[in-house]
Design a protein with these regions (language model features):
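Thiamine diphosphate
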Residues: 1-69
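Secretory-pathway/luminal and periplasmic proteins that interact with or process carbohydrate-rich
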Residues: 26, 80-83
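A general structural-boundary detector
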Residues: 35-38, 78, 135
Length: 168
C-alpha cells in the first residue's frame, strides 16, 4: 500500500517555500494544488505551517471552524537543511501536526547551483573552489533523516520520487 499525505475528500492547507518545487508545481494552467495554498520564503516553511496549524486549532476550539484540516508543506533542500532548519526544528520539537516534504535536488538549484549541506561530498557546484587542488565539496552530506528522527517525531521517511506531483 502507498502512504499518502492527502486522500480524496481531505481538506488541506498547503505551504510551499520558494524554490524548485514551488516553481515546478505551479505552472499555468495546471497547478498541482486544489486546496488552500500559501507561498512563503525559502527559510520559513516550518514557521508558516506551524503558525497556520496553531491558528486552526484555536479557531476550531472556539467553534469557528467545523471541518477537519490537514497541513502539509514543502521546502527545498537549501531551505530545509540550511537556512530554514531552525523553524522546522522548532515546529517539530513543539509537536505541531503537519507533514513536511523536502524537495531535495542536492543544491540551491533555483538560484544558481550553490552548495547546500544536502550537496553530496565531492560534488561540484558554482561555489566550489576552482583549481587542481579542489575535489569538490569537502564535507559529507548532512543526514537529515537522522537529525529529524532525533526530534522523537512519529515518522521520518525518504524516497526517490519521479512521478506526477499530483500523486503525492
Amino acid at each position: 500500500t502507498a502512504l499518502r499525505a492527502l486522500h480524496p475528500g481531505d481538506i488541506a492547507v498547503i505551504g510551499n517555500a520558494t524554490g524548485c518545487m514551488q516553481v515546478s508545481s505551479l505552472m499555468y494552467p495546471d497547478a498541482a494544488y486544489e486546496d488552500s495554498y500559501i507561498h512563503n520564503a525559502f527559510e520559513n516553511a516550518g514557521a508558516t505551517i506551524s503558525g497556520v496549524e496553531t491558528a486552526y486549532k484555536a479557531l476550531r476550539k472556539k467553534g469557528k471552524i467545523g471541518e477537519e484540516y490537514k497541513f502539509i508543506t514543502f521546502g527545498g533542500d537549501g531551505g530545509t537543511y540550511d537556512i530554514g532548519f531552525q523553524s522546522l526544528s522548532g515546529a517539530l520539537e513543539r509537536g505541531h501536526d503537519f507533514v513536511y516534504v523536502c524537495y531535495d535536488n542536492g543544491a540551491y538549484m533555483n538560484t544558481g547551483i550553490q552548495r547546500s549541506s544536502a550537496t553530496p561530498m565531492y560534488a561540484d557546484t558554482t561555489t566550489t573552489p576552482v583549481g587542481t587542488e579542489s575535489d569538490g565539496k569537502p564535507q559529507v552530506r548532512k543526514d537529515l533523516a537522522a537529525v529529524l528522527a532525533a526530534h522523537n517525531i512519529a515518522y521520518v521517511g525518504q524516497t526517490t520520487f519521479v512521478g506526477n506531483m499530483k500523486d503525492l
